[in-house]
Swiss-Prot record:
Principal location listed in the UniProt entry: secreted
Designated name of the protein: Low molecular weight protein antigen 6
Organism placement in taxonomy: Bacteria, Bacillati, Actinomycetota, Actinomycetes, Mycobacteriales
Domain of life where this protein originates: Bacteria
Entry's Gene Ontology cellular component terms: extracellular region
Pfam family, one: bPH_6
Protein keywords: Secreted
Subcellular location: Secreted
InterPro entries: CFP-6_PH
Length: 112
Protein backbone atom coordinates (compact mmCIF):
# COMPACT_ATOMS: atom_id res chain seq x y z
CA UNK A 1 0.00 0.00 0.00
CA UNK A 2 2.83 2.38 0.81
CA UNK A 3 4.35 1.73 -2.61
CA UNK A 4 1.18 3.13 -4.20
CA UNK A 5 1.83 6.43 -2.43
CA UNK A 6 5.40 6.39 -3.74
CA UNK A 7 4.03 5.72 -7.23
CA UNK A 8 1.75 8.74 -7.00
CA UNK A 9 4.67 10.84 -5.76
CA UNK A 10 6.65 9.67 -8.79
CA UNK A 11 3.83 10.69 -11.10
CA UNK A 12 3.74 14.09 -9.44
CA UNK A 13 7.48 14.49 -9.85
CA UNK A 14 7.28 13.70 -13.55
CA UNK A 15 5.70 17.10 -14.25
CA UNK A 16 8.73 19.16 -13.16
CA UNK A 17 11.16 16.59 -14.58
CA UNK A 18 9.54 16.59 -18.02
CA UNK A 19 9.20 20.38 -18.14
CA UNK A 20 12.62 21.13 -16.66
CA UNK A 21 15.02 18.17 -17.21
CA UNK A 22 17.60 19.61 -14.81
CA UNK A 23 15.28 18.50 -11.99
CA UNK A 24 15.66 14.81 -12.95
CA UNK A 25 17.64 14.03 -9.76
CA UNK A 26 14.34 14.52 -7.89
CA UNK A 27 13.44 11.01 -9.06
CA UNK A 28 15.94 9.67 -6.53
CA UNK A 29 13.45 10.56 -3.78
CA UNK A 30 10.86 7.88 -4.71
CA UNK A 31 13.61 5.30 -5.12
CA UNK A 32 14.92 6.06 -1.63
CA UNK A 33 11.41 5.93 -0.18
CA UNK A 34 10.71 2.54 -1.77
CA UNK A 35 14.03 1.20 -0.50
CA UNK A 36 13.20 2.33 3.02
CA UNK A 37 9.73 0.75 2.84
CA UNK A 38 11.28 -2.56 1.79
CA UNK A 39 14.24 -2.50 4.15
CA UNK A 40 13.12 -0.93 7.47
CA UNK A 41 11.59 -3.49 9.81
CA UNK A 42 11.73 -5.14 13.20
CA UNK A 43 11.78 -8.92 13.41
CA UNK A 44 10.99 -10.47 16.79
CA UNK A 45 11.06 -14.07 17.97
CA UNK A 46 11.46 -15.94 21.24
CA UNK A 47 15.24 -15.29 21.29
CA UNK A 48 15.25 -11.54 20.68
CA UNK A 49 14.74 -8.66 18.29
CA UNK A 50 16.47 -8.00 14.98
CA UNK A 51 16.31 -4.43 13.71
CA UNK A 52 16.90 -3.80 10.00
CA UNK A 53 17.90 -0.33 8.87
CA UNK A 54 18.73 0.94 5.39
CA UNK A 55 22.38 -0.07 5.63
CA UNK A 56 22.57 -2.82 8.22
CA UNK A 57 20.94 -4.81 10.95
CA UNK A 58 21.39 -5.44 14.64
CA UNK A 59 20.23 -8.37 16.75
CA UNK A 60 19.51 -7.93 20.47
CA UNK A 61 18.52 -10.67 22.92
CA UNK A 62 15.48 -10.13 25.14
CA UNK A 63 17.75 -10.32 28.20
CA UNK A 64 19.60 -7.21 26.98
CA UNK A 65 16.42 -5.12 26.72
CA UNK A 66 15.45 -3.18 29.84
CA UNK A 67 12.20 -1.69 28.52
CA UNK A 68 10.38 0.08 25.72
CA UNK A 69 9.67 3.80 25.28
CA UNK A 70 7.06 5.39 23.07
CA UNK A 71 6.82 8.93 21.77
CA UNK A 72 3.68 10.28 20.16
CA UNK A 73 3.65 9.54 16.45
CA UNK A 74 6.97 7.72 16.56
CA UNK A 75 8.32 4.21 16.50
CA UNK A 76 9.17 2.48 19.76
CA UNK A 77 12.63 2.62 21.25
CA UNK A 78 14.12 -0.25 23.19
CA UNK A 79 16.15 0.85 26.20
CA UNK A 80 19.07 -1.53 26.54
CA UNK A 81 20.76 -2.60 29.78
CA UNK A 82 23.89 -0.63 28.84
CA UNK A 83 21.83 2.60 28.74
CA UNK A 84 21.66 3.00 24.96
CA UNK A 85 18.49 3.10 22.93
CA UNK A 86 17.60 1.17 19.80
CA UNK A 87 14.85 2.40 17.49
CA UNK A 88 12.42 -0.36 16.51
CA UNK A 89 11.10 0.42 13.01
CA UNK A 90 7.37 -0.24 12.51
CA UNK A 91 6.76 -1.00 16.20
CA UNK A 92 4.06 1.27 17.59
CA UNK A 93 1.81 1.08 20.62
CA UNK A 94 -0.86 -0.46 18.38
CA UNK A 95 1.43 -3.32 17.32
CA UNK A 96 2.39 -4.31 20.89
CA UNK A 97 0.09 -7.39 20.88
CA UNK A 98 2.15 -8.80 18.00
CA UNK A 99 5.37 -8.10 19.91
CA UNK A 100 3.88 -9.76 23.01
CA UNK A 101 3.12 -12.89 21.03
CA UNK A 102 6.53 -12.99 19.35
CA UNK A 103 8.36 -12.43 22.64
CA UNK A 104 6.51 -15.26 24.40
CA UNK A 105 5.05 -12.78 26.88
CA UNK A 106 8.25 -10.90 27.78
CA UNK A 107 6.65 -7.70 26.50
CA UNK A 108 3.32 -7.17 28.30
CA UNK A 109 0.17 -6.61 26.26
CA UNK A 110 -1.41 -3.32 27.40
CA UNK A 111 -4.74 -4.25 25.81
CA UNK A 112 -5.47 -7.15 28.20
Amino acid sequence: MAHFAVGFLTLGLLVPVLTWPVSAPLLVIPVALSASIIRLRTLADERGVTVRTLVGSRAVRWDDIDGLRFHRGSWARATLKDGTELRLPAVTFATLPHLTEASSGRVPNPYR
